[in-house]
Structures are given as structure tokens and as C-alpha cells.
């Protein structure tokens, strides 16, 4: 009986020890697992924080990009967008031209602008420079003179007149050659053949030749007393209208003074502008001098500090006594 009791007691103790050991192990495992779990939780929380921060950054960047994009779209909507010439043509319902025509459109527009500027310059009026002279046996003997500022000697007086009519020379001289201009003024081949036939038909002894009037003598061979001499070619014309016609359509005669009068007008205009600028500068300089004069007078009237110091030193000198005129008389 005693042995059985001892065995039960020992079994109970062993079971308690094993239970205690198992409980210790479970506690140690729980203790070991608790910091790991906290670490895992901490790591997971850190991961969640990083994810949230990155999501916030991406959302901020995307929102800023959206704001910038929306602002650019508003600017484009507010500002009028220039349309290309092809789009304008398509809106009008016309067929767009070929690429060659589009490439040449800029050059043609530039050329038209230049030609219009030339025409507008000439439409303002052209100046003709001439001299009134007196003739004697076809030679200019005397003319009006004037005194210039540069020299005391009298020089020929040059006058100018502006054409009331619009002067249209045509295309610029760079585009048209003199041969084409001369060929336009010369008679054509058919006219020459017609003239040759009429000359061959008429005999030298026939009465038709005798009845025909003689060729008209040119104006520059007619003797005159007074006239208008062109400053370019020195030819004398009887009337101002003849001089104007000579300047405008002188190319028909093979020589034109048109360019001379244009350059002369340009040079005189430049000289006048320079003279006006010089006069304005002189007037401004005189005004500045007049303003500076009263200031200088005021400065001269006021005594300087050096003069006051000298006067005080002389008056305060003990060896020098200044007497009034009353003291001197006494």
C-alpha cells in the first residue's frame, strides 16, 4: 500500500513538474512572440506610413500637374489662336492651293508691298528743278541769281516745281531694262513696212511729194527769248508743260532725267532735315545758357566762406585798428 501511495505521489509530482515546465515554455514562447509581434506591427505600421506618404506625394504632384494643365488650357482658350492660311481658305470653302503657290505667296506679297510703296511715294508729287534763262541766238545768256550764305558771290538761282498730276513711272527700274522701254517707244515691224511702201509708191517728181508739208522742227531748235532750262541735261524748253513732259516721258527720246530729279529731291530733303536739326540744337543750347546765367549771377553775389573768414581775421587783428571817418576828422 505504501509503495502504491509513493508511486502516485511521484507521478503527481512528475505531472506537476511537466505541467510547470510546459507552462514555462508556453510563457517563454509567448514572451518571445510578443516583441516579434510588436516589431511586425511596427514594421507594418511603418510600411503603411510610407505608403500613405508616397500616395500623398503622388496626389500632390498629380494635382499640381492638373492645375498647370488647366491653367495652360485657359490661356489657350482666352488668347486668339492665329489660323494658318490653309485653315482660313478651308473655312471660306475654297480649295487649298498647291505647296508651290503657298511658298511663293510670301514673295509675291512682299513684291506687291514694295511696288505699292514706290507708287505711294511717287503719288505724293515729284519735284522738278529748273532755271529761268534768257536766250540770245539759241544760247542762254543771263539768268536770275541769288546770294548764298557760304559765299558772297551771286550764284544761279535754282527753282523747283511740284507736279500736280500723279507721276507713275511704272515698274521699278531693276525689273525693266532700257531696251524694253526703247522698244515700246519705237514703231513695230508692220508700221515700218507700211512706211517703206508709201515711200516707194511716191516718186520724187510727183506732185504729192511737193504738196506734203515739211517735217516739224523740234522745240529745242526753235529760237526763243525766254525759257526753262532742265538742271539735268541743260536743255531749254519754251513752256513749263514741255519741261514736265520731258521729265516724265524722256525715255522715249532715249535719255531720261527722271532719276536725277528724284535724287535731287532726296538730297535737298536730307539737307533741310539736317539744317532744322542744327537749328533746334542751337535753340536748345541758347536756352540752357540763358538759364545758367542767372544762377551764375546769384552765386557771384553771395560771398563765399573764404571771403568771410578773411574779413573776420583782418577785423579781429589786434595790431590793425580801423577808424571811422568821424574819428579821422577829429
Swiss-Prot record:
Residue ranges covered by zinc fingers (C2H2-type): 228-252
Annotated positions of the Phosphothreonine modification: 217
Cellular compartments per GO CC: nucleus
InterPro entries hit by this protein: Spt46-like
Main location class: nucleus
Tissue expression remark: Expressed strongly in testis and brain and weakly in prostate, spleen, pancreas and uterus.
Renumbered residue ranges of the record's region Disordered: 1-54, 76-104, 169-218, 270-330
Pfam families for this protein: Spt46 (PF17734)
GO molecular function, one term: zinc ion binding
Biased composition (Polar residues): 174-185
Biological process (GO), any one: transcription by RNA polymerase II
Bias (Basic and acidic residues): 189-200
Biased amino acid composition, Acidic residues: 275-293
Residue(s) carrying Phosphoserine: 315
Sequence similarity: Belongs to the FAM170 family.
Function: Acts as a nuclear transcription factor that positively regulates the expression of heat shock genes. Binds to heat shock promoter elements (HSE).
Protein name in the entry: Protein FAM170A
